[in-house]
């Protein structure tokens, strides 16, 4: 894997810097590394593809070295280099695709394609000169079963979940109280509602709670907490739990009271915040508990009182909500996030070449399914294919 990264890094630098008019002295070190790559690869043969519709391709290497010059690189020099670069880039691209479409239930962190296994041989280590990628660093750690650490921006840690629970319901669905939520990606939105605006509740207050368990532990997380849930701020028609009918939700937004968010690890509270909004941090957690209250306003103008009458019909429904968004965090496991295209890269290649469903990944690389059942086998395979996708993205956008 590290050899594949070094190949890609060398080729990227060569493609960017070996251009007509450049002083040879400015790229002499790069050309020396480029020639070392050619020397190491010459005389070797590889085969890629042969799974799904990914075609079988045979690769052989017999290239001349780039020479030295005292002056600028001319058009002939650059054209010779380009022919070599293009072949190598095509080879790396196909090795990456061949690796990204394969999976294994055992030791899925290790190379699975014949071509990448061959590149792992000792003689190709002479190519290896650069392992500065976070993915390569963590792949090496995971391969040795040591602790890894990925930094993510808006990590997709929450499987998609959109539902509701009713703490009070009636057959006519005209006086409901409960909670509805939408968890997806890096964001939780939860709303508590009471059609009667807590008129018969103790102290005219309704208590709500929403607990979310993560599939992986996050550390040093920067989080945004807001006293609102905008996705639940407009009228909608909702299917009943049994699917037999529908009910109408017409929210009027109030500010939540006594808001508390707890971050827990193995059932122990690590961080707690009360009535604190904006940016917060959490050190180490695998569970988030949100609690908040809806309080009937003790003093109301006539216009507000008309929204919340003392008896039915309740045409407007008192609603309070919270939004929790994980902006950045560190995780030992690889995840899809907002700043990278690894999941899309892997999924698109598997779809384009009609790769059959294997023993590890769900059909279509469905992320909700994958993260919901994030087994050690899936973790190993996902880290490997994401690492390869990161290498491929250096050369192929």
UniProtKB/Swiss-Prot annotation:
Residues 62-73 are annotated as: Interaction with the inner capsid protein VP2. It holds the Pfam family Rota_Capsid_VP6. Keywords: Calcium, Capsid protein, Intermediate capsid protein, Metal-binding, Ubl conjugation, Virion, Zinc. The N-terminus is blocked. Sumoylated with SUMO1 and SUMO2. Sumoylation of viral proteins seems to have a positive role on viral replication. Ca(2+) binds at residues 266, 286. SUPFAM superfamilies: A virus capsid protein alpha-helical domain, Viral protein domain. Disulfide bonds: none annotated. Signal peptide: none annotated. GO terms for cellular component: viral envelope; viral intermediate capsid. It comes from the Viruses. Zn(2+) binds at residue 153. Its main location: virion. InterPro entries: Capsid_hemagglutn, Rotavirus_A/C_VP6, Virus_capsid_a-hlx_vir. It is found in: Virion. Belongs to the rotavirus VP6 family. Intermediate capsid protein that self assembles to form an icosahedral capsid with a T=13 symmetry, which consists of 230 trimers of VP6, with channels at each of its five-fold vertices. This capsid constitutes the middle concentric layer of the viral mature particle. The innermost VP2 capsid and the intermediate VP6 capsid remain intact following cell entry to protect the dsRNA from degradation and to prevent unfavorable antiviral responses in the host cell during all the replication cycle of the virus. Homotrimer. Interacts with the inner capsid protein VP2. Interacts with the outer capsid glycoprotein VP7. Interacts with the outer capsid protein VP5*. The VP6 trimer contains a zinc ion located at the center of the molecule. The zinc ion is not essential for either trimerization or transcription activity of the DLP. Zinc-depleted VP6 has an increased sensitivity to proteases. This is Intermediate capsid protein VP6.
